[in-house]
Curated annotation (Swiss-Prot):
The keyword Aminoacyl-tRNA synthetase does not apply. Residues 65-82 have a biased composition (Basic and acidic residues). It comes from Yersinia pestis. The gene is lcrG. Residues 65-95 are annotated as: Disordered. The lineage of its organism: Bacteria, Pseudomonadati, Pseudomonadota, Gammaproteobacteria, Enterobacterales. It comes from the Bacteria. This is Low calcium response locus protein G. GO terms for biological process: negative regulation of gene expression.
Length: 95
């Protein structure tokens, strides 16, 4: 049977593995959010590089809020139930 000393290490190791997985998931979500609003990876690096956790959390929250606002403004299906119109130059032409 393992001693309690090894149990503490196992517990710490499992917590570290979960933290790494959460960090990877958070980084992936952040990349997707930045891509949605048109930020390049270089711009994201400049925004978040050298910042403390206290500065990063509000910035990520603001980024998430901005993405939510943009998604609410955009219709899900712009031509839902309507036929798309031809461009102005092509109206009246038979193809």
């Amino acid at each position: 049977m393992k001693s309690s000393h090894f149990d503490e290490y196992d517990k710490t190791l499992k917590q570290a593995e979960l933290a790494i997985a959460d960090s990877d998931h958070r980084a992936k979500l952040l990349q997707e959010m930045c891509a949605d609003i048109g930020l390049t990876p270089e711009a994201v690096m400049k925004i978040f590089a050298g910042r403390s956790a206290e500065e990063i959390k509000p910035a990520e929250r603001e980024l998430l809020d901005e993405i939510k606002r943009q998604r609410e403004r955009q219709p899900q299906h712009p031509y839902d139930g309507k036929r798309p119109r031809k461009p102005t130059m092509m109206r009246g032409q038979i193809i």
